[in-house]
């Protein structure tokens, strides 16, 4: 029987996600380092994976991992068929609309919006009755208005410092996010007793 597997998002969430597992009573035989992508708690027969945040919901939905810790922004953007078990008190950020500081009327009909989050962005503007053209990017979203690629952007924001440094102003909040503990639907039934103890940790 394969071990209970938990996928953690690499990057900013990872240290606090590991600390959360520690609160659950999970103790890894060997610590993670820059090359180690998986680690084991042999006492409890648990495997922990360190993978890209956008892959965590995929692993959990497909059953390659039983549970995962990832940002709500990723889960809601992907509309992943996973259980949203409970939010965790870290990884706070917002998906925001931002435009060049010099823009007088930035949100208008038929604007071009650059984003890494097309689903959440489309949904936000649809609810406002504004037609947009989406440009899907994978990084350096802040450069899009300056290069003429887009009129405005939606991007993750924690302090707003990066927006200001790139000559952008925050206009509206699209989505508030934090870390989320997610589960595979079948695994939740299989490991319900275990999950219940984690919820109380």
Each model region followed by its residue ranges:
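Domain-level signature for soluble enzymes in the chorismate/prephenate branch of the shikimate pathway
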Residues: 1-201
